[in-house]
Design a protein with these regions (language model features):
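Hydrophobic, membrane-interfacing alpha helices
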Residues: 1-227
Length: 227
């Protein structure tokens, strides 16, 4: 038992991603009928999702010019949907349904990555003026954001009431959250705005555009049925 605790403490990211994968697989198993897939395929999808998610956050960090060991959670926000689009086309599944089911899995994966930030001491908030050694709890605030989002979205996804809107709602909310919280995050810049503010705005715009398109499509389909 002691050896297990030591290994977990030495490799927190691997342990957290393993936990995230297990939770993701459980969710996919519960909703696999929505994806019309077998139980073993749901397991493979959960594992593949984590691996692709890790590659996404590392690739985006590389694009931003960070070092090889860095991660940027915007990578998951921007790159993972491309995987959903590809998977939906290859396996001939409705894209909205695929995105709805996998959005909580993505959120859990990013949550695990942010917990790793706390354990590894990176991505800290700015020092709070007048309070010696205490920083703004930006990472902890992000974890609360994820939890609230999951609490609000998962029941609706479970009941099939999101209609493909789970992902755009997530990226809109995340864009707003990150834009605000970045003012309190410690960055290697003296300017008020920095790169993450830009990506937050991009995230918000993507979410709005997708949400609007889904709403337009629904209205068009309803008009067609009423004729």
């Amino acid at each position: 038992m002691d050896q297990l605790i030591i290994r977990v403490s030495q490799h927190p990211l691997i342990s957290l991603l393993t936990l995230g994968t297990v939770l993701g697989v459980i969710w996919l198993e519960l909703l696999r009928k929505r994806l019309r897939t077998s139980w073993w395929a749901a397991v493979l999808l959960g594992i593949a999702h984590t691996l692709i998610g890790v590659l996404s956050v590392k690739a985006f960090a590389f694009i931003e010019g960070a070092d090889a060991g860095a991660m940027s959670l915007f990578g998951g926000v921007f790159f993972m949907p491309l995987t959903y689009i590809l998977g939906a086309k290859l396996f001939k599944r409705p894209l909205g349904e695929v995105a709805d089911v996998f959005t909580p899995v993505m959120v859990v994966t990013l949550m695990c990555a942010r917990i790793n930030c706390i354990l590894s001491g990176c991505c800290m908030g700015l020092p709070i003026p007048g309070v010696n050694g205490v920083r703004f709890p930006t990472r902890e605030a992000e974890l609360i954001f994820y939890l609230v989002l999951l609490i609000l979205l998962c029941p609706k996804i479970w009941r099939g009431r999101t209609g493909g809107r789970a992902y755009p709602v997530y990226v809109m909310a995340y864009g707003v959250f990150r834009f605000i919280v970045e003012f309190f995050r410690d960055q290697n810049t003296t300017s008020l705005f920095h790169l993450s503010h830009f990506w937050a705005v991009v995230s918000l715009c993507i979410g709005i555009s997708i949400y609007v398109e889904i709403s337009k499509k629904e209205k068009f389909e309803k008009r067609g049925l009423n004729k």
